[in-house]
């Protein structure tokens, strides 16, 4: 009898230990899962960094709106037909969902940031094409405005696009069509422009899209230095005869943007068309 009780006690103790270990295991994974969920729900940080070498259709970090789609690992900002021919009057946007802390209200400090991406804009060998695309920083809740197709690049509408109106948007535009508010010189059209609070570029430089081979790969690098407050843009077409295009401006982001922003791409076509494809994208910011 004593031996039987001893075996029963050992079995019971072993079972209790097993249950305890399983309980700890489940509790650990529950906490880990909960922590992961909470961080996903509130993904705010002083530093953000990512690198996308190929776009995935089910990427939870990228939110697509309008006519933007992902196919064959490419982010296609505006609509095309089945043969890849661009369609008129389309508007598309892709937003990276994690908020970016671009400046701090308490300390007054500004963030440094840099981003790079490769892109292809196919003009179908026509000098008449449009409208363009832009990399932008904007408010957390920034919907696509109504009447923002064509030259408004899906970022502005006719009521808030021009000075003295100051929309809380910073954009680097790749503008393929000359509107009445664009640089007057034919040398500067198409152009790469820095838009600070309006669709009228504060600074701009020539975009050689009409002179590079069809489907040429462009590479853009955009950097912001918090000490000098200088935003610098470098665009090149490797393997072609064109040197890099450079444009920069001094801008205090505290006077333009809210503390927290989201980043992304926006693009449009009008009656004239072109493709707007982003091949890869990386970004890094630190406050």
From Swiss-Prot:
Matches recorded under Gene3D superfamilies? 2.60.120.200
Membrane topology for this entry?
Single-pass membrane protein
All ranges on the Cytoplasmic side of the membrane: 1-11
- Alphabetical list of SUPFAM superfamilies matching this protein: Concanavalin A-like lectins/glucanases
InterPro entries with a match to the protein in the record: ConA-like_dom_sf, L-lectin, Lectin_LegA_CS, Legume_lectin_dom, Leguminous_Lectin
Q: Name one GO cellular component term.
A: membrane
Instruction: Write out the transmembrane intervals.
Output: 12-31
The main location class comes to: membrane
Localization in the cell: Membrane
Under the GO molecular function aspect, what terms does this record hold? carbohydrate binding
> Which named protein is this?
Lectin 10
Annotated organism of origin:
Medicago truncatula
């Amino acid at each position: 009898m004593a031996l039987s009780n001893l075996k029963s006690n050992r079995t019971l103790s072993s079972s209790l230990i097993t249950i305890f270990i399983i309980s700890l295991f489940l509790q650990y994974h529950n906490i880990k899962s909960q922590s992961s969920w909470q961080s996903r729900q509130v993904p705010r940080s002083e530093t953000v960094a990512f690198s996308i070498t190929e776009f995935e259709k089910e990427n939870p970090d990228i939110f697509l709106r309008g006519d933007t789609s992902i196919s064959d690992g490419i982010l296609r900002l505006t609509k095309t037909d089945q043969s890849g021919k661009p369609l008129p009057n389309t508007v598309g946007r892709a937003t990276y969902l994690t908020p970016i802390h671009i400046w701090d209200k308490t300390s007054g400090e500004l963030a440094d940031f840099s981003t790079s991406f490769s892109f292809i804009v196919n003009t179908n060998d026509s000098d008449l094409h449009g409208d363009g695309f832009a990399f932008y920083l904007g408010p957390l809740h920034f919907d696509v405005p109504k009447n923002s197709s064509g030259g408004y690049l899906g970022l502005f509408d006719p009521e808030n696009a021009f000075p003295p109106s100051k929309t809380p948007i910073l954009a680097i535009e790749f503008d393929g069509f000359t509107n009445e508010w664009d640089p007057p010189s034919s040398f500067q059209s198409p152009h790469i422009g820095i838009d600070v609070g309006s669709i009228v570029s504060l600074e701009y430089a020539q975009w050689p899209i009409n002179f590079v081979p069809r489907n040429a790969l462009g590479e853009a690098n955009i950097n912001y230095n918090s000490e000098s407050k200088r935003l610098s843009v470098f665009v090149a077409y490797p393997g072609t005869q064109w040197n890099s295009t450079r444009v920069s401006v001094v801008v205090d982001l505290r006077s333009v943007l809210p503390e927290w922003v989201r980043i992304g791409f926006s693009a449009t076509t009008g009656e004239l068309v072109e493709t707007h494809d982003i091949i890869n994208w990386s970004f890094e910011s630190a406050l």
